[in-house]
Amino acid sequence: IGQGENVDNLKKLITELKLQDQVIFPKNLTKDEKNSYLKCSDVFVMPSITYKKSVEGFGIVYVEAAQFGVPSIGGKDGGAADAIDHDQTGYICDGNSLDDVYQSISNILENNKYKVFGKKAEEISKKFYWSEIIKNYLEIF
């Protein structure tokens, strides 16, 4: 969902994987439209990279995907690892390496692994609910 400077490389990868009929690149979506796409997705892929000393922080979008039972593939740069449990709820890869992104996508699609990861992701996403976060803060004080 969205665009970026690597969209052409990603489209090339999608063609190599023969996934043109299964992957789309929508942009300018409302929150409801975004959630509708997430609900019917098998995998969420956002391999963040460091760019001019700037990097994705926490990456709430991984948690948003997880709440719908969608596992994620995130980049090792930034905060993806705070929301993705590698090899349990998705994969952390080198977003600068097209081969690593490709391998992560291939691995998660293999033997429908994304379904198992998605169930775990949905369970773990609950720890990020505001009610849980507030409860944890109150326990500290």
Predicted regions: what they are:
Residues I49-G59, V63, A81-D82:
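Nucleotide-sugar-dependent
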Residues N9-E33:
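Nucleotide-activated donor-binding/catalytic signature segment of Leloir-type glycosyltransferases, i.e.
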Residues W130-F141:
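C-terminal alpha-helical cap of glycosyltransferases
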Residues L10, G74-D87, Y91-I92:
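Short acidic/histidine- and often glycine-rich active-site loop of Leloir-type glycosyltransferases
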Residues Q22, D100, K113-K127, E139:
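A short, well-ordered alpha-helix in the C-terminal region of glycosyltransferases
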Residues H86-D87, Y91-L98, N107-N112:
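Conserved acidic donor-binding segment of nucleotide-sugar-dependent glycosyltransferases
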Residues K39-S54, V70:
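Acidic donor-binding loop of glycosyltransferase active sites
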Residues Y62, Q67-G74, I84:
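Short hydrophobic beta-strand element within catalytic cores of glycosyltransferases
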